[in-house]
Curated annotation (Swiss-Prot):
Family affiliation: Belongs to the UPF0145 family.
Classification via Pfam families: YbjQ_1 (PF01906)
Record PANTHER family: UPF0145 PROTEIN YBJQ
Coiled-coil portions: none
InterPro entries named in the record: UPF0145_dom_sf (IPR035439), UPF0145_YbjQ-like (IPR002765)
Protein name in UniProt: UPF0145 protein HD_1349
Length: 105
């Protein structure tokens, strides 16, 4: 399945628009545990533990987006956008991937 942030797929014609699809993932972060686990990463100015959590959650959101698109008969998702938002007491976050499911030829 083609997943793209662009509104079209180069050299491919959109045959049918199937509708808006979403992939949503809520993840948690234990700040105290993660802080001690990543103290070395933070000395370098980056937190590898949090980056890894974001990467995994983003991939899960994209997998969910693809599942929704397949379930409605699409073979591509165009105009994909990914949003990040903290929730609650900042120890939870949500990643939402959205796009338009289409059939391309």
């Amino acid at each position: 399945m083609i997943i793209t942030t662009t509104p079209t797929v180069e050299n491919r014609q959109i045959i049918e628009y199937k509708g808006l699809v979403f992939g949503e993932v809520v993840a948690g972060a234990n700040i105290i545990r993660d802080f001690f686990a990543s103290i070395t990463d933070m000395i370098g100015g980056r937190s590898g533990v949090y980056e890894d959590k974001l990467n995994v959650a983003r991939q899960e959101a994209l997998v969910e987006l693809q599942k929704q698109a397949r379930n409605i008969g699409a073979n591509a998702v165009i105009g994909v956008s990914i949003q990040y938002q903290s929730m609650g007491k900042k120890d939870m976050f949500i990643i939402v991937a959205t796009g338009t499911a289409v059939v391309i030829g």
